[in-house]
Amino acid sequence: MPQQNSYSKEDLVKAGTGELFGEGNSQLPSDNMLMMDRIITISEEGGENGKGFILAELDITPDLWFFDCHFKGDPVMPGCLGLDAMWQLVGFFLAWTGGPGKGRALGVGEVKFTGQILPTAKKVTFKIDFKRVIKRKLYMGLADGSVSVDGREIYTAKDLKVGLFTDTSKF
């Protein structure tokens, strides 16, 4: 598939089955663990550091799976799912730029939670700003990210790290 600057839910589902970037290359999680409904913009230029950025969204509805189990009587989206969404987007960016291999989260320097996502929310926006992209034997992305709900920033992450690996057997 030619490189696009935005992706629909249908495109992202294809990224979860290996159809978007080819067999053996980076895939997004499928089904419930796919944490975005669309990528609004993806670019190798621009962003806070001039090294590329992504803007993506997740529509919130009260029937999303995690609200039933986290927590009973006090439903809130787990913060770790927002963090995972940011890692998913860093990996997607690496594959989108032509990186071979399977994506693996390698860490994060700092995460701060200053709000929550409730079933009454409408939209979550993920913003990823790349600080560095290494394209050698190892493809690796280093980025800062944020999660906003209905226009209010509620999570930030510094130094999100994701790598692409052609062999994950010794990982």
From Swiss-Prot:
Protein's recorded name: 3-hydroxydecanoyl-[acyl-carrier-protein] dehydratase
GO BP: any one term: unsaturated fatty acid biosynthetic process
GO cellular component labels: cytoplasm
Chain's role: Necessary for the introduction of cis unsaturation into fatty acids. Catalyzes the dehydration of (3R)-3-hydroxydecanoyl-ACP to E-(2)-decenoyl-ACP and then its isomerization to Z-(3)-decenoyl-ACP. Can catalyze the dehydratase reaction for beta-hydroxyacyl-ACPs with saturated chain lengths up to 16:0, being most active on intermediate chain length.
InterPro entries per the UniProt record, alphabetical: FabA, FabA_FabZ, HotDog_dom_sf
Location, primary (coarse class): cytoplasm
Reactions it catalyzes: a (3R)-hydroxyacyl-[ACP] = a (2E)-enoyl-[ACP] + H2O; (3R)-hydroxydecanoyl-[ACP] = (2E)-decenoyl-[ACP] + H2O; (2E)-decenoyl-[ACP] = (3Z)-decenoyl-[ACP]
Pathway as given in its UniProt record: Lipid metabolism; fatty acid biosynthesis
Recorded family membership: Belongs to the thioester dehydratase family. FabA subfamily.
Keyword Isomerase among UniProt keywords: yes
Subunit structure: Homodimer.
UniProt GO MF annotations: (3R)-hydroxyacyl-[acyl-carrier-protein] dehydratase activity; trans-2-decenoyl-acyl-carrier-protein isomerase activity
Active site: 70
Subcellular location: Cytoplasm
Domain of life: Bacteria
Record-listed E.C. numbers: 4.2.1.59, 5.3.3.14
Coiled coil: none
Record's keyword terms, sorted: Cytoplasm, Fatty acid biosynthesis, Fatty acid metabolism, Isomerase, Lipid biosynthesis, Lipid metabolism, Lyase
